[in-house]
């Protein structure tokens, strides 16, 4: 697995994918985490900037379901195999998020 759960964290810098709007709380049990190294290796920063025009590397970025679909399409078309695999894993989590919330938040490192 390319994404981590809270219990899998080993002290590296991570991006937290958190359900709903940013509320200032971190390290949630139902969040998923991507290490900074994996984020960079998969090239996610360039794909977020291409899809949204911005990405807050050190702060929160809220992503709506519509924006997520746009992002997935770009990665499916242009991303590496690693990027596509990572996005598929995030998407499994996002699907459960969007059943209850209209967005998720990526908390920067």
Q: Whereabouts are the PLM-identified features?
A:
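Acidic (Asp/Glu-rich) sequence patches and key acidic residues
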Residues: 1-105, 109
């Amino acid at each position: 697995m390319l994404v981590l759960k809270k219990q899998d964290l080993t002290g590296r810098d991570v991006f937290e994918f958190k359900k709903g709007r940013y509320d200032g709380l971190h390290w949630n049990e139902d969040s998923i985490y991507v290490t900074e190294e994996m984020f960079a290796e998969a090239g996610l920063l360039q794909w977020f900037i291409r899809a949204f025009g911005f990405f807050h590397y050190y702060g929160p970025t809220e992503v709506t379901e519509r924006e997520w679909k746009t992002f997935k399409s770009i990665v499916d078309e242009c991303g590496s195999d690693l990027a596509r695999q990572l996005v598929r894993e995030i998407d499994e989590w996002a699907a459960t998020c969007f059943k209850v919330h209209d967005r998720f938040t990526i908390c920067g490192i």
